[in-house]
Amino acid sequence: MNKTVALFGSTGLIGSEILKQLIHDDDYETINVITRKKVTVQSKKIKNYIIDFTNLDGYKKVIKKGDVVIASIGTTQSKVNFNKSEYRKVDYNILLNLAKACKSNDASSLSFVSSAGANAKNKNFYLKLKGEIENSIIQLDLKSCLIFRPSLLLGKRNEFRFGEMIAQKIMPLFSFLMKSDYKPIKAVDVAKSIVNECKKKNKGYKFYHFDDILKVV
């Protein structure tokens, strides 16, 4: 397997857990962490590349042939002042440019975090957008693309989200009533499953829901 992984999105709940897993995983020698500003996590494995996420050429410079690429990129409505156009620039445009660079530079695989319920025909803005980016990336016909669809993530964020904090306390109490795809899941388990699946020689497109994720932790 390739000893180099390129990680886009290393500070969020899942991204930070992915970085921890990669640092302690002997199968990877080099972690290219691509960010907007310098990372604070220290490791001999880490090489930090700061790029302009709005420029496609920036992605092409840091993604190399054969790289394993992982993306855990996203924003929130509050961060973009509830501007749907700005939200789309992050959750759709950035990820699509990243995927295009994977295609043109012949990356071995792309794994990214989507959402349970993602559907381009959904009336919900968030789920519709997630479905649209999934469809757009699938149309690129990458060598290998792993799409992870967790529901509510359990774990401690660096930032405070009141609504999510309440949901994290309440939803697990009723998870036995939910369909498995929509059950809350630990962010660390999602991260472990992504890192583990990246080591396999998967071909084409594969979706991972709640049960699928827990099977490969």
Features from the language model and the residues they span:
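Structural motif
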Residues: 4, 67-68, 109
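Oxidoreductase cofactor-interface core, primarily capturing Rossmann-like NAD(P)-dependent enzymes
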Residues: 24, 120-217
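Short, polar loop motifs at secondary-structure junctions
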Residues: 32-40
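NAD(P)H-binding glycine-rich loop region in Rossmannoid oxidoreductase-like domains
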Residues: 46-97, 101-104, 198
